């Protein structure tokens, strides 16, 4: 059964992660990339939320920074500070020399997971959107202003465009390899969509995403986080099959403007799930009421937080199953 076949399908962004005690037990002994690069371990982590919550889809345990790492970027993820990235200053620094070797663990994780995952569960592969990955590697991490990238775009436009082109081509290769190894859905995480001007959004988010979607033969979920009203342009011009919505968008606006173009995914505020179970349940009911005229995928407006109580996740799932 596909995610698209149920009245309400459910999975959570970052569902395999630090809110799960079984994940913490493994992560105490290994770094993040050690876990990602150990296919048996990564597959075990991928399956943990399925075994605990019986969700409708697993998403491979990996990271959007696996791709730029495979293109030669020096990247690490620290438990205390997050991504530590050696900034790139030239598109020529991106190389395919170790590409196959570096993506191999994720592909093997997908293959192992598909064999263990029940056939009625979907397996989601993913990548970061080229814009988001470019911002990470030019900035050397996350920055609330992205001044370095904006300077790069305005002073070295053609080189930035080349970086986006390289990342787009690599993403297409990477995602198609994920499909060959057993993924049956793809999500594109455009986490920094909010940082793009309207012109940048069109050229560096919409156009690359359209190219990626047209090159993939399974349903694609697009997530242009923080894009606001530009969500409509994104869903109309990229041809994504599913539009994943963040929790800043009004439910009636989503239903009126987006649900006519694609299956809606979202959009419970992960802060509510972490800190206010009562309100999380009320908002879950509002979401179900808003979107239930058509099939939709219940998810969060962003990744689940490590502080999230398991009881809150279980309560939300119980409510949704009662309405399915």
Swiss-Prot record:
| Assigned keywords, A-Z | Cytoplasm, Decarboxylase, Lyase, Porphyrin biosynthesis
The pathway entry for this protein reads as: Porphyrin-containing compound metabolism; protoporphyrin-IX biosynthesis; coproporphyrinogen-III from 5-aminolevulinate: step 4/4
Residues annotated to bind substrate? 14-18, 32, 63, 136, 191, 302
The enzyme's E.C. designation:
4.1.1.37
| Entry keyword annotation includes Cytoplasm | yes
Look up the record and report any one GO term of the cellular component aspect: cytosol
Residues the UniProt record annotates as site (Transition state stabilizer): 63
How this chain assembles, per its entry, is: Homodimer.
Identify the NCBIfam families for this entry: hemE
This protein's name: Uroporphyrinogen decarboxylase
């Amino acid at each position: 059964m596909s995610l698209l076949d149920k009245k309400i399908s459910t999975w959570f962004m970052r569902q395999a992660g630090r809110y799960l005690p079984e994940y913490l037990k493994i992560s105490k002994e290994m770094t993040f990339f050690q876990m990602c690069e150990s296919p048996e371990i990564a597959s075990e982590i991928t399956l943990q939320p399925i075994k605990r919550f019986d969700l409708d889809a697993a998403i491979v345990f990996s990271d959007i920074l696996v791709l730029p790492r495979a293109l030669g970027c020096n990247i690490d993820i620290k438990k205390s500070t997050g991504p530590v990235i050696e900034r790139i200053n030239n598109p020529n620094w991106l190389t395919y020399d170790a590409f196959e070797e570096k993506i191999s663990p994720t592909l093997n994780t997908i293959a192992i997971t598909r064999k263990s995952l029940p056939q009625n569960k979907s397996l989601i592969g993913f990548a970061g959107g080229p814009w988001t990955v470019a911002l990470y590697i030019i900035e050397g991490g996350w920055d609330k202003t992205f001044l370095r990238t904006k300077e790069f775009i305005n002073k070295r436009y053609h080189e930035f465009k080349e970086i986006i082109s390289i990342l787009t081509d690599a993403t297409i290769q990477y995602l198609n390899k994920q499909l060959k190894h057993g993924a049956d859905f793809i999500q594109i995480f455009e986490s920094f969509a909010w940082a793009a001007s309207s012109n940048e959004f069109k050229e560096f988010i919409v156009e690359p995403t359209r190219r990626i979607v047209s090159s993939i033969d399974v349903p694609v979920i697009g997530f242009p986080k923080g894009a606001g009203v530009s969500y409509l342009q994104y869903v109309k011009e990229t041809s994504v099959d599913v539009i994943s919505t963040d929790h800043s968008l009004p439910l009636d606006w989503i239903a009126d403007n987006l649900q006519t173009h694609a299956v809606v995914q979202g959009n419970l505020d992960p802060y509510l799930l972490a800190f206010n179970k009562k309100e999380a349940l009320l908002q879950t009911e509002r979401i179900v009421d808003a979107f239930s005229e058509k099939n939709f995928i219940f998810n969060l407006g962003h990744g689940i937080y490590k502080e999230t109580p398991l009881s809150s996740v279980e309560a939300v799932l119980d409510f949704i199953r009662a309405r399915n």
